[in-house]
Design a protein with these regions (language model features):
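C-terminal engagement/docking regions of AAA+ P-loop ATPases
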Residues: 63-158
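Conserved C-terminal "switch" segment of AAA+ ATPases
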Residues: 1-84, 95-102
Length: 158
């Protein structure tokens, strides 16, 4: 899984200065397309890599042979992949095209990217409900412990 710096590098391949950028975003960065694209990439990384209740996805209880059991929380960042990052940018591009066709400003914006992150997170919530503890062990790279339980976190778990 990419860390925040690696995620920003991956996003640099997908969210480039030559893409249509929201006019308000460009104005906020003095018309500098590179600075605008870099700022938008940071928006995505900050939304994905924040460690708070909004980004908490799963609570995993693992069995350990020596110490018993432990519980940890996985956040969006723990599940982020290059494919997810590309999908977020793609969703935001689609939203900007739809907005422009409807008479709006169009172009990539912080708001559209945050919405794309939220949509991708919801899609991951759907996946978490259909995956076994063994599948999660493979996904998160847990080989030294056995996953006893996986509990979905977020809006639907309260």
């Amino acid at each position: 899984r990419p860390d925040a710096a690696a995620a920003e590098e991956i996003l640099a391949r997908h969210l480039t200065a030559d893409l249509p950028l929201d006019p308000a975003e460009l104005t906020a960065h003095g018309g500098d397309r590179e600075a605008t694209a870099a700022s938008l990439r940071r928006v995505v990384v900050e939304a994905l890599y924040a460690r708070n209740e909004a980004t908490a996805v799963l609570e995993i209880t693992e069995a350990h042979t020596v110490s018993g059991a432990s519980t940890r929380v996985l956040h969006l960042a723990d599940l982020t992949s290059g494919a997810m990052l590309a999908a977020i940018v793609s969703r935001a591009k689609t939203a900007s095209i739809k907005d422009e066709l409807a008479g709006g400003a169009g172009g990539l914006s912080a708001a559209r990217l945050r919405l794309a992150v939220e949509t991708e997170a919801r899609q991951n919530e759907e996946i978490t409900g259909a995956t076994t503890p063994e599948g999660w062990a493979r996904l998160i790279g847990t080989r030294t412990s056995q996953i006893l339980s996986v509990r979905r976190l977020g809006k639907e778990s309260t």
